[in-house]
Protein backbone atom coordinates (compact mmCIF):
# COMPACT_ATOMS: atom_id res chain seq x y z
CA UNK A 1 0.00 0.00 0.00
CA UNK A 2 1.04 3.61 -0.50
CA UNK A 3 3.46 5.06 2.03
CA UNK A 4 3.02 8.77 2.86
CA UNK A 5 6.55 9.99 2.20
CA UNK A 6 5.76 13.24 4.00
CA UNK A 7 5.61 11.34 7.32
CA UNK A 8 8.90 9.83 8.51
CA UNK A 9 7.13 7.74 11.15
CA UNK A 10 4.92 6.07 8.53
CA UNK A 11 7.95 5.38 6.34
CA UNK A 12 9.62 3.60 9.27
CA UNK A 13 6.48 1.55 10.00
CA UNK A 14 6.27 0.45 6.37
CA UNK A 15 9.94 -0.52 6.37
CA UNK A 16 9.43 -2.74 9.41
CA UNK A 17 6.14 -4.13 8.11
CA UNK A 18 7.62 -5.12 4.75
CA UNK A 19 11.14 -6.06 5.85
CA UNK A 20 12.10 -9.59 4.79
CA UNK A 21 15.21 -11.78 4.90
CA UNK A 22 16.43 -13.94 1.99
CA UNK A 23 15.58 -17.12 3.90
CA UNK A 24 12.07 -16.00 4.97
CA UNK A 25 10.64 -13.90 2.15
CA UNK A 26 7.00 -14.36 3.17
CA UNK A 27 7.37 -13.64 6.89
CA UNK A 28 7.90 -10.21 8.52
CA UNK A 29 11.54 -10.15 9.56
CA UNK A 30 11.66 -8.16 12.81
CA UNK A 31 11.19 -11.04 15.27
CA UNK A 32 13.42 -13.30 13.15
CA UNK A 33 16.22 -10.74 13.15
CA UNK A 34 16.03 -10.28 16.92
CA UNK A 35 16.20 -14.04 17.48
CA UNK A 36 19.11 -14.38 15.05
CA UNK A 37 20.89 -11.52 16.80
CA UNK A 38 20.52 -13.24 20.19
CA UNK A 39 21.63 -16.57 18.70
CA UNK A 40 24.73 -14.92 17.26
CA UNK A 41 25.54 -13.46 20.69
CA UNK A 42 25.16 -16.93 22.23
CA UNK A 43 27.45 -18.49 19.63
CA UNK A 44 30.12 -15.84 20.23
CA UNK A 45 29.94 -16.33 24.01
CA UNK A 46 30.19 -20.11 23.79
CA UNK A 47 33.08 -20.01 21.32
CA UNK A 48 35.12 -17.28 23.01
CA UNK A 49 34.65 -18.60 26.56
CA UNK A 50 34.49 -22.31 25.67
CA UNK A 51 31.38 -22.84 27.78
CA UNK A 52 28.13 -24.77 27.45
CA UNK A 53 24.94 -22.71 27.94
CA UNK A 54 23.33 -25.55 29.90
CA UNK A 55 26.21 -27.00 31.91
CA UNK A 56 27.66 -23.55 32.63
CA UNK A 57 24.38 -21.66 32.80
CA UNK A 58 25.36 -19.10 35.45
CA UNK A 59 28.60 -18.16 33.70
CA UNK A 60 26.85 -18.17 30.33
CA UNK A 61 24.11 -15.75 31.45
CA UNK A 62 26.65 -13.40 33.01
CA UNK A 63 28.75 -13.37 29.85
CA UNK A 64 25.66 -12.92 27.70
CA UNK A 65 24.65 -9.85 29.66
CA UNK A 66 28.13 -8.37 29.21
CA UNK A 67 28.04 -9.10 25.48
CA UNK A 68 24.56 -7.61 25.07
CA UNK A 69 25.65 -4.42 26.83
CA UNK A 70 28.74 -4.17 24.64
CA UNK A 71 26.71 -4.65 21.45
CA UNK A 72 24.13 -2.08 22.53
CA UNK A 73 26.69 0.64 23.30
CA UNK A 74 26.90 1.96 19.74
CA UNK A 75 23.19 1.40 19.17
CA UNK A 76 22.45 3.46 22.27
CA UNK A 77 24.40 6.38 20.83
CA UNK A 78 21.90 6.48 17.94
CA UNK A 79 18.79 5.86 20.05
CA UNK A 80 18.91 5.04 23.75
CA UNK A 81 15.20 4.16 23.66
CA UNK A 82 15.78 1.63 20.88
CA UNK A 83 18.71 0.08 22.75
CA UNK A 84 16.67 -0.12 25.96
CA UNK A 85 13.89 -1.90 24.10
CA UNK A 86 16.31 -4.50 22.71
CA UNK A 87 17.79 -4.98 26.18
CA UNK A 88 14.30 -5.54 27.61
CA UNK A 89 13.52 -8.04 24.85
CA UNK A 90 16.56 -10.11 25.78
CA UNK A 91 15.74 -10.07 29.49
CA UNK A 92 12.10 -10.95 28.82
CA UNK A 93 13.06 -13.90 26.60
CA UNK A 94 15.55 -15.10 29.20
CA UNK A 95 12.87 -15.41 31.91
CA UNK A 96 10.07 -16.50 29.58
CA UNK A 97 8.10 -13.25 29.85
CA UNK A 98 6.32 -13.43 26.50
CA UNK A 99 3.97 -10.54 27.30
CA UNK A 100 6.85 -8.08 27.66
CA UNK A 101 8.69 -9.55 24.66
CA UNK A 102 5.60 -9.05 22.48
CA UNK A 103 5.22 -5.50 23.82
CA UNK A 104 8.78 -4.76 22.73
CA UNK A 105 8.04 -6.08 19.25
CA UNK A 106 4.91 -3.93 19.07
CA UNK A 107 6.86 -0.83 20.14
CA UNK A 108 9.62 -1.54 17.63
CA UNK A 109 6.96 -1.81 14.91
CA UNK A 110 5.80 1.68 15.76
CA UNK A 111 2.67 0.67 17.65
CA UNK A 112 1.64 2.66 20.69
CA UNK A 113 1.94 0.86 24.02
CA UNK A 114 0.80 1.70 27.53
CA UNK A 115 2.76 3.92 29.89
CA UNK A 116 3.33 1.00 32.27
CA UNK A 117 4.90 -1.09 29.51
CA UNK A 118 7.08 1.81 28.45
CA UNK A 119 8.31 2.09 32.04
CA UNK A 120 9.09 -1.63 32.05
CA UNK A 121 11.05 -1.22 28.82
CA UNK A 122 12.69 2.02 30.03
CA UNK A 123 11.62 3.89 26.91
CA UNK A 124 10.44 7.48 27.10
CA UNK A 125 8.37 7.82 23.94
CA UNK A 126 6.52 5.98 21.21
CA UNK A 127 7.48 6.28 17.56
CA UNK A 128 7.02 9.82 16.26
CA UNK A 129 8.36 12.04 13.52
CA UNK A 130 11.25 13.33 15.63
CA UNK A 131 12.75 9.87 16.30
CA UNK A 132 11.71 7.89 13.20
CA UNK A 133 14.96 8.52 11.31
CA UNK A 134 16.98 7.39 14.33
CA UNK A 135 14.90 4.21 14.46
CA UNK A 136 15.66 3.49 10.79
CA UNK A 137 19.37 3.92 11.50
CA UNK A 138 19.10 1.75 14.61
CA UNK A 139 17.34 -1.14 12.85
CA UNK A 140 20.03 -1.02 10.17
CA UNK A 141 22.73 -1.28 12.85
CA UNK A 142 20.90 -4.22 14.44
CA UNK A 143 20.83 -5.98 11.07
CA UNK A 144 24.59 -5.61 10.75
CA UNK A 145 25.11 -6.86 14.27
CA UNK A 146 22.94 -9.90 13.49
CA UNK A 147 25.20 -10.79 10.58
CA UNK A 148 23.41 -9.26 7.60
CA UNK A 149 25.21 -7.16 4.98
CA UNK A 150 22.74 -4.33 5.38
CA UNK A 151 19.30 -3.11 4.40
CA UNK A 152 17.76 -2.47 0.97
CA UNK A 153 14.86 0.01 0.95
CA UNK A 154 12.79 0.24 -2.23
CA UNK A 155 10.27 3.06 -2.61
CA UNK A 156 8.13 2.49 -5.69
CA UNK A 157 5.80 4.87 -7.56
CA UNK A 158 7.11 8.10 -6.07
CA UNK A 159 5.02 9.95 -8.64
CA UNK A 160 2.04 9.53 -6.29
CA UNK A 161 3.48 12.44 -4.29
CA UNK A 162 2.43 14.69 -7.18
CA UNK A 163 -1.18 13.84 -6.36
CA UNK A 164 -1.02 15.14 -2.79
CA UNK A 165 -3.68 17.84 -2.60
CA UNK A 166 -1.80 20.12 -0.21
CA UNK A 167 1.37 21.76 -1.47
CA UNK A 168 2.72 21.63 2.09
CA UNK A 169 2.41 17.82 2.06
CA UNK A 170 4.24 17.60 -1.27
CA UNK A 171 6.97 19.90 0.00
CA UNK A 172 7.37 17.79 3.15
CA UNK A 173 7.62 14.59 1.08
CA UNK A 174 10.24 16.05 -1.25
CA UNK A 175 12.14 17.53 1.69
CA UNK A 176 12.17 14.11 3.36
CA UNK A 177 13.49 12.58 0.14
CA UNK A 178 16.20 15.24 0.02
CA UNK A 179 17.11 14.36 3.60
CA UNK A 180 17.42 10.64 2.76
CA UNK A 181 19.65 11.49 -0.21
CA UNK A 182 21.89 13.79 1.81
CA UNK A 183 22.20 11.33 4.69
CA UNK A 184 23.03 8.47 2.35
CA UNK A 185 25.58 10.62 0.53
CA UNK A 186 27.18 11.54 3.86
CA UNK A 187 27.26 7.88 5.01
CA UNK A 188 24.50 8.54 7.53
CA UNK A 189 22.86 5.27 6.46
CA UNK A 190 25.89 3.01 6.36
CA UNK A 191 25.25 -0.35 4.64
CA UNK A 192 21.81 0.83 3.53
CA UNK A 193 20.83 1.00 -0.16
CA UNK A 194 17.90 3.17 -1.27
CA UNK A 195 16.18 2.59 -4.61
CA UNK A 196 13.43 4.94 -5.75
CA UNK A 197 11.28 4.62 -8.85
CA UNK A 198 9.00 7.12 -10.52
CA UNK A 199 7.81 8.46 -13.85
CA UNK A 200 9.40 11.02 -16.12
CA UNK A 201 6.68 13.47 -15.06
CA UNK A 202 7.97 13.30 -11.51
CA UNK A 203 11.30 14.65 -12.73
CA UNK A 204 10.05 17.20 -15.21
CA UNK A 205 6.78 18.77 -14.00
CA UNK A 206 6.27 21.61 -11.58
CA UNK A 207 4.41 19.40 -9.07
CA UNK A 208 7.35 17.02 -9.12
CA UNK A 209 10.95 17.37 -8.00
CA UNK A 210 11.27 20.78 -9.62
CA UNK A 211 9.00 22.21 -6.92
CA UNK A 212 11.82 21.80 -4.38
CA UNK A 213 14.94 23.32 -5.88
CA UNK A 214 17.44 21.84 -3.36
CA UNK A 215 16.16 18.34 -4.21
CA UNK A 216 16.12 18.96 -7.96
CA UNK A 217 19.67 20.32 -7.87
CA UNK A 218 20.86 17.08 -6.27
CA UNK A 219 19.27 14.65 -8.70
CA UNK A 220 18.86 16.35 -12.08
CA UNK A 221 20.71 14.68 -14.95
CA UNK A 222 20.79 15.12 -18.71
CA UNK A 223 18.03 12.88 -20.01
CA UNK A 224 19.38 13.06 -23.55
CA UNK A 225 22.90 12.00 -22.61
CA UNK A 226 23.62 8.84 -24.61
CA UNK A 227 26.23 7.67 -22.10
CA UNK A 228 24.51 5.99 -19.15
CA UNK A 229 26.48 6.52 -15.96
CA UNK A 230 25.29 3.99 -13.39
CA UNK A 231 26.72 6.15 -10.62
CA UNK A 232 24.52 9.15 -11.36
CA UNK A 233 21.57 9.77 -9.01
CA UNK A 234 18.86 9.17 -11.64
CA UNK A 235 18.82 6.64 -14.47
CA UNK A 236 16.17 7.00 -17.17
CA UNK A 237 14.89 3.63 -18.38
CA UNK A 238 13.79 3.09 -21.96
CA UNK A 239 10.10 2.40 -22.41
CA UNK A 240 8.97 -1.08 -23.39
CA UNK A 241 7.75 -1.58 -26.95
CA UNK A 242 5.73 -4.45 -28.41
CA UNK A 243 8.82 -6.55 -29.09
CA UNK A 244 10.01 -6.20 -25.48
Predicted ranges, named:
Residues 101-244:
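The catalytic "switch" region of P-loop NTPases
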Residues 1-146:
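P-loop NTPase nucleotide-binding core
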Amino acid sequence: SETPLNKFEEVYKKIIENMRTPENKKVPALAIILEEWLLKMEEIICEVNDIDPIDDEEIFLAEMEKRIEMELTDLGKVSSNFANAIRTYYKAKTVGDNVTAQAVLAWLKGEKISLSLKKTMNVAVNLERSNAILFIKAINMLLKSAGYSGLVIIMDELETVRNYVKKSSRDEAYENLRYFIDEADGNGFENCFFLYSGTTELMETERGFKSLEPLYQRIKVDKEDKFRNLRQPVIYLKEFNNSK
